[in-house]
Amino acid sequence: MKSTRPFHPTPVITIDGPTASGKGTVAALVAAHLGFHLLDSGALYRLAALASIRYQVEPNDADALAKLVDGLHITFREGCAQLDGVDVSDEIRAEAVGNRASAIAVHAPVRAALVARQRAFRKTPGLVADGRDMGTVIFPDAVLKVFLTASVEARAARRHKQLMQKGFSANMDNLLQDLRERDARDSNRAAAPLKPAADAKPLDTSALTIEQSVEQVLAWYRELGQPA
């Protein structure tokens, strides 16, 4: 059955979920298939985190962090994340940067400083946005909202493989502990906690391939009467 839900002129598909659930890869492939723009909101937070480390801004100083974010020069070009005109795509994936990103994301002023930048990614013909609150806070009128989940063991294995491929060292036990701690922080923070939107479609990717996950998202989009 086709949905009768009203559509924004520029459709958005949101893909939310915890760290290492596969949402970034799935979002990128869905966007490429549809010819849509892509927003990796996690990269924005990691860029802010990297800047806070470089400029020695304390992770608990919410006002200073928000001011830092306001002045950052952030761009995405040809799949690369740039900070002050320099490609830092690999650097922002380091474990220490990820930990800092999760730590500063608990501050409402920091999140508010990044909201406008995230919403500005909505351009024709459409947008696929991945993150933790894309469907609940940033794009509540998205035409399709997906919430990806996976067991913490599956997610740790994925993150370990990803880090090793990038040339970073990683310990599986440490990754498991880190993911559990991040899940607790992200789910319990006062500002936009990690949770599925009421109208989000849940997708457990623990036993699915990337291709199967992508096809499920596209199938849901087709059910809305949209070409995919």
UniProtKB/Swiss-Prot annotation:
Family classification: Belongs to the cytidylate kinase family. Type 1 subfamily.
Amino-acid positions noted as binding ATP in the UniProt annotation, renumbered to this chain: G17, P18, T19, A20, S21, G22, K23, G24, T25
Keywords for the protein's UniProt record, in alphabetical order: ATP-binding, Cytoplasm, Kinase, Nucleotide-binding, Transferase
Any one annotated GO CC term: cytosol
Claim: DNA damage is one of the keywords in the record: no
Cell compartment(s), UniProt: Cytoplasm
Any Gene Ontology biological process: nucleobase-containing small molecule interconversion
Leading EC class: transferase
GO molecular function: ATP binding; CMP kinase activity; dCMP kinase activity
Name of the protein in question: Cytidylate kinase
Pfam families associated with the record: Cytidylate_kin
InterPro entries per the UniProt record, alphabetical: Cytidylate_kin, Cytidylate_kinase_dom, P-loop_NTPase
Entry-linked SUPFAM superfamilies: P-loop containing nucleoside triphosphate hydrolases
The protein's Enzyme Commission number: 2.7.4.25
Catalytic activity entry: CMP + ATP = CDP + ADP; dCMP + ATP = dCDP + ADP
Highest taxon of source: Bacteria
